[in-house]
């Protein structure tokens, strides 16, 4: 009986040690066992245009619409775009191109006044420009593509979290609600009315009512389209000082940050998400 009792105690001790070792190993491998995994996708509402009625939801990567705000990266992207936008066509006259002689305007001594040089001196109001450059001047700067993609996603995320990003679409997804009769599943206005056998385009009237209905008149708006939308361009032409209609391939960080409301087609959002997500993943893998 004593041998059997000792054997049972030994087995229990071995089992306890094995359980303790397993728990210790798990705690070592996972120091935060109760930590939640952050979501990889955010549900974005898809709407019709111009009523902005919700139609359905689509998952969009959180790296595109829910990225944490990084003002430093946004600033680098804005400076990069503005530098590359500079034409560099200025051609100011230098000392050798101003046309004046090299003779001193006054003697070096004896006049009782301060010393002066020739008429080409940059200190004179009609003198040559100091360190004048000859056009063309290249002011472009460089920025890693990974950093620019992060800035682009930051700009979209900032507008989305501020409630100023509206996704328009519904042609390629299952709709929860039907599209209203006078609406479209894209950023366009093609409504016409027939009067005495002639078709009259009413897009400008509809667009004006759209601005008044959602209190957008006088605000800077950005419409990002998948393709060229002639109806939208024609309708927004009277407000071109405040309204920008840009195709998805030509959108910049400046455009997104400058806008007070952004309307983007679902296909364009998918294109931008894949383009900049691929760029980030490619840079990380390298």
UniProtKB/Swiss-Prot annotation:
It is found in: Mitochondrion. Its main location: mitochondrion. Residues 1-26 form a transit peptide. Pfam families: Ribosomal_L4. The keyword ATP-binding does not apply. Residues 85-132 are annotated as: Disordered. GO terms for molecular function: structural constituent of ribosome. SUPFAM superfamilies: Ribosomal protein L4 (SSF52166). One of its GO terms (biological process) is mitochondrial translation. GO terms for cellular component: mitochondrial inner membrane; mitochondrial large ribosomal subunit; mitochondrion. Keywords: Mitochondrion, Ribonucleoprotein, Ribosomal protein, Transit peptide. Component of the mitochondrial ribosome (mitoribosome), a dedicated translation machinery responsible for the synthesis of mitochondrial genome-encoded proteins, including at least some of the essential transmembrane subunits of the mitochondrial respiratory chain. The mitoribosomes are attached to the mitochondrial inner membrane and translation products are cotranslationally integrated into the membrane. PANTHER family: 50S RIBOSOMAL PROTEIN L4, LARGE RIBOSOMAL SUBUNIT PROTEIN UL4M. Present with 1200 molecules/cell in log phase SD medium. Belongs to the universal ribosomal protein uL4 family. Component of the mitochondrial large ribosomal subunit (mt-LSU). Mature yeast 74S mitochondrial ribosomes consist of a small (37S) and a large (54S) subunit. The 37S small subunit contains a 15S ribosomal RNA (15S mt-rRNA) and 34 different proteins. The 54S large subunit contains a 21S rRNA (21S mt-rRNA) and 46 different proteins. This is Large ribosomal subunit protein uL4m. It comes from Saccharomyces cerevisiae (strain ATCC 204508 / S288c) (Baker's yeast). The gene is YML6.
């Amino acid at each position: 009986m004593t041998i059997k009792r000792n054997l049972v105690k030994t087995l229990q001790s071995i089992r306890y040690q094995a359980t303790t070792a397993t728990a210790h190993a798990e705690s070592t491998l996972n120091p935060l066992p109760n930590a939640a995994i952050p979501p990889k996708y955010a549900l974005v509402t898809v709407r019709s245009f111009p009523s902005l009625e919700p139609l359905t939801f689509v998952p969009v990567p959180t790296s595109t619409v829910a990225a944490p705000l990084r003002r430093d990266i946004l600033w680098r992207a804005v400076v990069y775009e503005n530098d590359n936008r500079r034409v560099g066509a200025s051609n100011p006259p230098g000392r050798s191109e101003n046309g004046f002689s090299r003779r001193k305007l006054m003697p070096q001594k004896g006049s009782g006044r301060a010393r002066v040089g020739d008429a080409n001196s940059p200190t004179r109001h009609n003198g040559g420009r100091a360190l004048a450059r000859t056009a063309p001047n290249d002011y472009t700067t460089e920025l890693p593509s990974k950093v620019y993609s992060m800035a682009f996603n930051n700009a979209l995320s900032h507008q989305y979290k501020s409630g100023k990003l509206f996704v328009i679409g519904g042609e390629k997804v299952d709709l929860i609600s039907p599209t209203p009769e006078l609406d479209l599943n894209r950023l366009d206005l093609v409504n016409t009315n027939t009067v005495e056998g002639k078709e009259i385009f009413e897009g400008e009237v509809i667009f004006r009512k759209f601005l008044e209905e959602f209190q957008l008149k006088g605000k800077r708006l950005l419409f990002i389209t998948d393709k060229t939308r002639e109806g939208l361009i024609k309708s927004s032409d009277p407000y071109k000082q405040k309204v920008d209609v840009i195709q998805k391939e030509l959108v910049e960080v400046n455009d997104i940050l400058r806008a007070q409301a952004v309307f983007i087609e679902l296909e364009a959002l998918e294109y931008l998400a894949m383009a900049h997500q691929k760029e980030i993943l490619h840079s990380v893998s390298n």
